[in-house]
Curated annotation (Swiss-Prot):
Enzyme Commission identifier(s): 2.7.1.144
Top-level taxon in the UniProt lineage: Bacteria
Cellular component per GO, a single term: cytosol
Molecular function terms, GO-annotated: ATP binding; phosphofructokinase activity; tagatose-6-phosphate kinase activity
Gene this protein is translated from: lacC
Catalytic activity from the UniProt record: D-tagatofuranose 6-phosphate + ATP = D-tagatofuranose 1,6-bisphosphate + ADP + H(+)
Record-stated family: Belongs to the carbohydrate kinase PfkB family. LacC subfamily.
Keywords, ordered alphabetically: ATP-binding, Kinase, Lactose metabolism, Nucleotide-binding, Transferase
Name of protein: Tagatose-6-phosphate kinase
GO BP annotations listed: D-tagatose 6-phosphate catabolic process; lactose catabolic process via tagatose-6-phosphate
Recorded metabolic or biological pathway in which this protein acts: Carbohydrate metabolism; D-tagatose 6-phosphate degradation; D-glyceraldehyde 3-phosphate and glycerone phosphate from D-tagatose 6-phosphate: step 1/2
A Pfam match: PfkB
Amino acid sequence: MILTVTMNPSIDISYPLDELKIDTVNRVVDVTKTAGGKGLNVTRVLSEFGDSVLATGLVGGNLGEFLVEHIDNQVKKDFFSIQGETRNCIAILHGDNQTEVLEKGPEVLEQEGQDFLEHFKKLLESVEVVAISGSLPAGLPVDYYASLVELANQAGKPVVLDCSGAALQAVLESPHKPTVIKPNNEELSQLLGREVSEDLDELKEVLQEPLFAGIEWIIVSLGANGTFAKHGDTFYKVDIPRIQVVNPVGSGDSTVAGISSGLLHKESDAELLIKANVLGMLNAQEKMTGHVNMANYQVLYDQLIVKEV
């Protein structure tokens, strides 16, 4: 079983409009509300793929109850309740444009943060792999993910970590390392304080920087150009076919689902990388975020090429 962790989930609300009128009333006919957050996208894709998944994180108030109720019934759930209210994230779809209003989210009390660590520690007993995704809510220390990674390491559970900014920096500077990280070029540039290109020789040098020491897998998305990866001392380039992109949002989360599934099933390097890329591509072909059509899985799978470089 895979444990997904979403520390700052949201209710994602979609308002489709023909036109967004400013400083007046806009009436919406069809409103969509879903359980949102990067970790819950991972959860949905794992469930659709057929893997057993347990979802956890922080929820609060009436919106927190709504969120838990609107997660697929096939998914096991064990969220931790806090005093603060789970946030809304609003997307106004007008014409070919999308305007977003994102709430900051609740402020987590120090004791709640400590109590969740105990909650997380207990959940580790019943899972084989951990996937941690997304931002930290206000109130938690910047090195909180390092604390989760430490507990998972102590329990012998591999961790796939998908975060960015100061939270990722804190983990990289910690002695407690995740099994997998999946930065993109922009995030690598931010971490190193210099521009990082997609040149394979440069990426090889970058991923051997001391900052990344001790991390077994580093998987770098190159968008339409595929993926560059480092596993131990071995480097790989994944070439992907061109596809018709409908909605790329959530493709990174779907990739995390594939990585986590590959670890769960102890797949070869090539199998893990292909699965991760295929799930990311399948998400991009769907209108709904964090959703894959498994009927197209094998067709794409057979087109991917993994090369050791």
